[in-house]
Amino acid sequence: MDFFLYVFILKEKTMAITKEEIQGTKILNEVESSNLVRTEYDTETKKMIAEFKNGMRYEYEGVPHQTYTSFRSAQSQGNFFNKNISKTFPYKKIS
């Protein structure tokens, strides 16, 4: 019984992590992370916007779609973001 309860909780948590909405060329996602709240990715411009829990938003340029897909499926999206996006791609603060 404990095993099935654990799997159910894990499944519910995973479903929350992968919630996304597509609007034209933009993919909008809610993120479960200690710092990130949501992300937005534009498949045409290859720009990714990351919104943090402190309300700050940053736009990262030239993020390949495969990198964004890997970010979305990472076990720890926060760690993946820190290692593979925030320190790799040029960015600017947008709010």
Protein language model annotation of sequence segments:
Residues 1-14:
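Short, Lys/Arg-enriched N-terminal segments with co-localized hydrophobic residues
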Residues 13-95:
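Acidic/histidine-enriched, beta-strand-rich ligand/metal-binding domains
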